[in-house]
Amino acid sequence: MKKVIAIDMDQVLADLLSDWVAYINTYDDPFLKEKDILCWDIKKYTNTNNNVYRHLDYDLFRNLNVIEGSQRVTKELMKKYEVYVVTTATNHPDSLKAKLEWLTEYFPFIPHSNVVLCGNKNIIKADIMIDDGIHNLESFEGMKILFDAPHNRNENRFIRVMNWEEIERKLL
């Protein structure tokens, strides 16, 4: 039986942060930079406060760039593991359709039955989780792989990977 890997979508497969920051900067001042975001709560770095989340809409999620190497390595992982994409989507209902369409376009080799759209990842049971969110890995019981991002740079409790090539070396 294959081991199960749960892979986060935003900031692991899809480059949410750069597009979100660019979108926020069209409405907000001062000019926000990705490297300046040192914690999960992006609203601490903007003048829009809670309204920063209004930018998490269909168009943003549908048009994200693919993280380099993620398609090729995910396809290789599927030969050895049962791969699921697990993404928090129910907190932003406009993202549900967009995320599924995005995955269908850029990761057509992942069946829809292996896509989990949820609100809280603490229900996920797998052998390995790859995520950029510290809070998602804290409650996970398997191997915890932290995908590097500006907001998690001070974290050292998990296996850190800088890119998909490192995931390939560790898991294949």
Swiss-Prot record:
Query: What is the enzyme's main class?
Result: hydrolase
**Which cofactors is this protein said to need?**
Mg(2+)
UniProt binding sites for Mg(2+): 8, 10, 132
GO annotation terms (biological process): pyrimidine deoxyribonucleotide catabolic process
- Gene3D superfamilies named in the record: Deoxyribonucleotidase, domain 2 (1.10.40.40), HAD superfamily/HAD-like (3.40.50.1000)
The UniProt keyword set, sorted, is: Hydrolase, Magnesium, Metal-binding
Q: Report the active site residues.
A: 8 (nucleophile), 10 (proton donor)
GO MF, one annotated term: metal ion binding
Identify the EC number(s): 3.1.3.-
Please explain the role this protein plays, according to its UniProt record.
Answer: Dephosphorylates nucleoside monophosphates such as the 5' and 2'(3')-phosphates of deoxyribonucleotides in vitro. Also catalyzes the dephosphorylation of coenzyme A (CoA), pyridoxal-5'-phosphate (PLP), riboflavine-5-phosphate (FMN) and nicotinamide adenine dinucleotide phosphate (NADP) in vitro.
> What family name appears in the similarity comment?
Belongs to the 5'(3')-deoxyribonucleotidase family.
Put simply, this protein is called 5'(3')-deoxyribonucleotidase
Which lineage do the record's taxonomy fields give for this organism? Bacteria, Bacillati, Bacillota, Bacilli, Bacillales
